[in-house]
Design a protein with these regions (language model features):
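Mobile-element integrase/transposase regions
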Residues: 1-40, 48-58, 62-68, 101-105, ...
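RNase H-like two-metal-ion nuclease catalytic core shared by retroviral integrases
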Residues: 70-74, 78, 85-132, 148
Length: 230
């Protein structure tokens, strides 16, 4: 049964497919479908992973707002395979992936799907897209991710007008995105690094100088979706 409100629950998944039929490399379509309305947001990436998930979700949020819940499978991008630490066991919490941690900071509930059948709406979407969208990309002669993303951005509004449905309730439960640059600080990879006595840290096998002298044993390094580091 569908949720009644737009923004209440969004299904997310990645479809690995030969989207360009040999005109370019195989890639992944990261797709979001609203459970109440079947409205679709989608974007192509070269792989399904944390940075593509964060980048696509950030773009979704900037267009529609922050949903209440996200439904995803047990891919390690979404669900951490790690065993709980002693501290987590004592606190009654579970390990989180970087993406799961970001959703928690945004107040989004991450719901795990235990089978493809549980993600019926997004699975049916991919069946449709692997037919309809592949044909559209073929007609346009598209063979790169960059060109495909420009095409999909222009094509999806007409697709949604045709196939989205009216939700049972009119209220949209999406919330505004965080003000300022907070979204960039949340949807990023956060890693704790040991702060040396000379105020340097080692990250990705590189030595970095911390400009502001702080009294701490560790600092948090942020790898952002745009490739910058803070």
């Amino acid at each position: 049964e569908r949720r009644a409100h737009v923004g209440d629950l969004i299904q997310l998944d990645g479809s690995h497919h030969d989207w360009f039929e040999g005109r370019g490399a195989r890639c992944v379509l990261m797709a979001y479908i609203d459970d109440a309305s079947s409205r679709v947001f989608a974007r192509f990436y070269d792989h399904e992973g944390t940075i593509p998930a964060m980048d696509s979700f950030q773009r979704y949020v900037m267009q529609y707002g922050v949903p209440l819940a996200l439904y995803a499978d047990k891919h390690t991008t979404y669900q951490s395979p790690a065993e709980p630490t002693v501290e987590e066991q004592l606190a009654g919490t579970k390990p989180q992936s970087q993406f799961g941690r970001a959703l928690s900071e945004l107040g989004v509930e991450l719901i795990a799907a235990h089978s493809p059948q549980a993600k019926g709406r997004v699975e049916r979407l991919f069946n449709t897209m692997q037919d309809r969208l592949v044909k559209e990309l073929r007609l346009a002669g598209i063979g790169t991710i960059e060109a495909a993303n420009r095409f999909v951005e222009a094509w999806l509004p007409s697709y949604n007008r045709r196939f989205a449905v009216q939700p049972a309730q009119a209220a949209d439960l999406h919330r505004p995105p965080p003000a300022g640059g907070d979204l960039n600080r949340i949807l990023c990879l956060k890693t704790s690094r040991c702060l040396r006595r000379d105020w340097t840290v080692v990250h990705h096998r590189q030595l970095y100088q911390v400009r502001t002298h702080v009294r701490a044993a560790h600092v948090i390094v942020e790898d952002r979706v745009d490739g910058t580091m803070r």
